[in-house]
A protein has these predicted regions:
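Membrane-contacting alpha-helices and adjoining membrane-interface segments
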Residues: 1, 16-91, 125, 129-150
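Generic recognition of well-ordered alpha-helical segments
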Residues: 15, 170-174, 222
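Hydrophobic alpha-helical membrane-association signature
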Residues: 83, 171-172, 216, 220
Length: 222
């Protein structure tokens, strides 16, 4: 009877929490995690109450759970660090679903598809799924490429020493001025970047909306 009534109460609490979360501005991934936590935690509490009701000493249950928890914790140390990492990512929000990120330790990069409890899933530009453990991700430096609304495109063009630099700059500037994705409020920069052994590197800088970055870069390089 205690289990039946208790589980009904837990289900009701979960439904109420779900309605409250839906009316809030809380991130969807965080909502799912918290609802799971409430549901599992509530059921564990109900079972604990039911067992103590039938005469098992609470101290015995606590001791048993403590021993089991210690053994489980040692065997799942890596998994627990990933869960903790997932919680940190959900709370601090260094990125969200749809952002393009670069993980500092391994250099893996891609668009965030999902932030799970154990792993974060990225989709690379060549359509590969990359699964990064949350424990690693929460302890690494993260570059969030899409954090800002606009992004600078940096390109290098090599020319021969015999070329007229002023003429090259004029041609390149005209090319970038015609680029449809360019943010016209931002200046175009054409400059001598470096002198190589057999060529001169001409640098190009201009700004685009973040979502237009790759298409614009590829279009200009063509």
């Amino acid at each position: 009877l205690i289990l039946f009534i208790g589980f009904k109460i837990v289900s009701y609490v979960v439904k109420m929490a779900h309605k409250i979360f839906e009316r809030s501005i809380m991130d969807t991934t965080l909502q799912t995690f918290l609802l799971s936590f409430i549901k599992i935690g509530g059921k564990v509490l109900v079972i604990f109450m039911a067992v103590t009701k039938i005469g098992v000493a609470a101290s015995s249950i606590v001791a048993l759970l403590g021993s089991a928890g210690l053994a489980l914790g040692l065997s799942l140390q890596g998994s627990l660090s990933n869960i903790a990492g997932g919680v940190i990512l959900l709370l601090l929000k260094p990125f969200q679903v749809g952002d393009y990120i670069i993980e500092g330790n391994s250099g893996k990069e891609g668009t965030v598809q999902a932030i799970g409890i154990m792993y974060t899933k990225l989709l690379s530009v060549d359509n590969k799924a990359i699964m990064i453990p949350n424990g690693n991700l929460s302890n690494a430096s993260i570059t969030n490429v899409t954090y800002q609304e606009k992004r600078r495109v940096d390109l290098n063009v090599g020319i021969e020493y015999s070329e007229d630099i002023k003429k090259v700059r004029k041609v390149l500037n005209a090319l970038i001025e015609k680029e449809p994705a360019r943010i016209t409020d931002e200046p175009v920069k054409i400059y001598v970047n470096e002198f190589q052994a057999s060529s001169i590197d001409i640098g190009i800088r201009y700004w685009v909306k973040t979502e237009d970055y790759w298409e614009s870069r590829w279009r200009v390089l063509e």
